[in-house]
A protein has these predicted regions:
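Structured catalytic-domain cores with a bias toward divalent-metal coordination
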Residues: 1-155
C-alpha cells in the first residue's frame, strides 16, 4: 500500500463480527486502511488512503495507474505504542497532531476546566517520538487515552 506505518494488533471482540475478520479466518488476505479521522472528513488523509488503494491495485496488476511508489512501511505492534492519558476531565485542547515529532517533557495538550475556563492540567509527552494517534473530540474524561506515540528508537 505504500503507507508510512503498518500496525499489527490482536483482534478485539468487536472485530470478530466484521467481514474482514471472517475473510481472514477463512484464509483470504484482507486488509483494513484507516485514516487520521473517522468521524469527520480529513481531505489530506482521505487522498492518501485513495492513493494507497490505487497503488496496491496497480502493483497487483488489477489496474493501470501512474502514481508515486509510496513509503517503505515501518511495522509497529500496537502494544509498542506509548499511550498518554489525561489526569482530569474537561474541555480538551490538542496541541500536537498525528505525524508531529514530540520530545520528553513537551506539553502536547491541555485540559480546561469547563466552569472556570482555566487550564486544569497539562498533558505531557513521556518520551521522544512521533504522534501516531491524537484524540480530536472537544471533551475528555479523566484517565482517557488522548495520544499514542511511536517511541523514537534512535536518531
Amino acid at each position: 500500500f505504500g503507507l508510512q506505518y503498518v500496525v499489527i494488533r490482536k483482534p478485539k471482540p468487536m472485530d470478530t463480527a466484521t467481514l474482514n475478520y471472517s475473510w481472514q479466518m477463512n484464509g483470504t488476505n484482507a486488509f483494513s486502511i484507516y485514516t487520521n479521522a473517522t468521524d469527520t472528513i480529513d481531505d489530506k488523509s482521505a487522498r492518501q488512503a485513495v492513493s494507497s488503494v490505487l497503488r496496491f491495485l496497480t502493483r497487483m496488476g488489477i489496474l493501470k495507474y501512474n502514481n508515486h511508489s509510496g513509503y517503505i512501511a515501518s511495522v509497529i505492534n500496537e502494544h509498542e505504542l506509548l499511550a498518554v492519558k489525561t489526569y482530569d476531565g474537561g474541555f480538551y485542547r490538542r496541541l500536537k497532531s498525528p505525524g508531529d515529532p514530540v520530545f520528553h517533557g513537551d506539553i502536547i495538550g491541555e485540559v480546561i476546566d469547563p466552569f472556570e475556563g482555566f487550564v486544569k492540567s497539562q498533558i505531557v509527552s513521556q518520551t521522544d517520538g512521533i504522534v501516531f494517534f491524537a484524540h480530536t473530540a472537544p471533551t475528555v474524561m479523566g484517565n482517557q487515552v488522548v495520544y499514542k506515540i511511536i517511541r523514537r528508537m534512535h536518531e
